[in-house]
Amino acid sequence: MASKEEILAGLAEIVNEETGLDTAEVQPEKSFTDDLDIDSISMMTIVVNAEDKFGVKIPDEEVKNLKTVQDAVDFIXGA
């Protein structure tokens, strides 16, 4: 399983590919919607790409609980 640092780096790459945001902007405390301006459609693409990259399943009902980058890192690490 990937370390939390590896998960964060992987998520930053995925967010960069989807939104064009610099990977340095994707920090654990950042909110996907408020800080990174990621809409629901982009978020679903990010989730699908994260599932593929990390070999996990993130149920649709869990996606709404992934408010911050850290929430996503913690979920993936614990999956």
From Swiss-Prot:
Carrier of the growing fatty acid chain in fatty acid biosynthesis. The keyword Zinc does not apply. Coiled coil: none annotated. It is found in: Cytoplasm. One of its GO terms (cellular component) is membrane. The gene is acpP. Pathway: Lipid metabolism; fatty acid biosynthesis. It comes from Myxococcus xanthus. 4'-phosphopantetheine is transferred from CoA to a specific serine of apo-ACP by AcpS. This modification is essential for activity because fatty acids are bound in thioester linkage to the sulfhydryl of the prosthetic group. This is Acyl carrier protein. The keyword Lyase does not apply. GO terms for biological process: lipid A biosynthetic process. Keywords: Cytoplasm, Fatty acid biosynthesis, Fatty acid metabolism, Lipid biosynthesis, Lipid metabolism, Phosphopantetheine, Phosphoprotein. One of its GO terms (molecular function) is acyl binding. The modification O-(pantetheine 4'-phosphoryl)serine is found at residue 40. Residues 2-79 form the Carrier domain. Belongs to the acyl carrier protein (ACP) family.
